Amino acid sequence: MSEEPAAKRMKNADEFPNLRSEVAGPVKEKLIELDAIQHQLDVMSENAAEEVLKVEQIFNQKRLPIYEKRKKLTTKIDNFWQTAFLNHHLLSTAIPEEQEDLLAALRDLEVQEFEDLRSGFKIIMTFDPNEYFTNEVITKSYHLQSESPSTEITEIEWKENKKPPFPEDGDSAHTFLEWLTYAALPDSDEIAEVIKDDLYVNPLQYYVMPDMQEVEEDDIEDFLNEERGVDENGQRIPRRNISDSLKVDQDESADGQEGEDEEEEDMGEEEEDGVEEEAEGEEEEEDGAIEEEGGDENVEAHVAVNPENTAE
């Protein structure tokens, strides 16, 4: 959050006092020439930074309507920001369990950089009704380019016995509620820096990440490496976006369903085969019964034709 260093001013021979006694004249002249070249490079770097800033200002304005589209979606997802905070590998350490319900009331989070992108930014938080305070919107403003950098915060209307005590070290906040309440100097506000430069830039990657308390450290590192686009050895790898991940899940689900359907179809065919075999068995029994009945009729007929056999 600190200002960029200014370009160095070109030195002259009088500003190299040590060289007068320790370095020969030709070497001293070359060093002075080198310093003049370095001055030109510093000026060019400063000019380049100004041009980059102008481009960044243009694209910062172009991002605004896209952020608005994102906002319309995130506000419709229950506990979106709470989940993103709790899954963040740094921010989650500042959120004790008893403060998680406050984050559940965080309906929207917005970062607004000042127009010149250098003088500061705001973090604007919109809350649903909660047990801590009556404010709907709380804003923290960070002013960076004045002679004495400062932080301004909305006056919070606390409910009874809900205001947290002032941080023991009097400098930095250790919990989210302390950070929300007290104004630390901009250059020591790590929570604000992480929110601005990481969480707000891409909250979705943390929303879909598994619960930080339920995953191993190696799994976290693997996930973060994938988001950075590198493998465990630091080599670049193709980055798979969230929609691709969701598509893979859907494909796996479809494959699983297809497998279940095939299994059910096989079972159905086996049942049909069993029914057919059972029917064939019944038909055989019926044929046997008919044959037996036919045999009895033949015997009776034979007896009727030869009555002497009966007399005997």
Swiss-Prot record:
Tissues with expression: Widely expressed.
Similarity field: Belongs to the nucleosome assembly protein (NAP) family.
Record protein name field: Suppressor of presenilin-2
Domain of life of the native organism: Eukaryota
One term of GO molecular function: chromatin binding
GO biological process: nucleosome assembly; regulation of egg-laying behavior
Disruption phenotype annotation: Loss of function results in a suppression of sel-12 mutant phenotypes, possibly by up-regulating hop-1 expression.
Organism: Caenorhabditis elegans
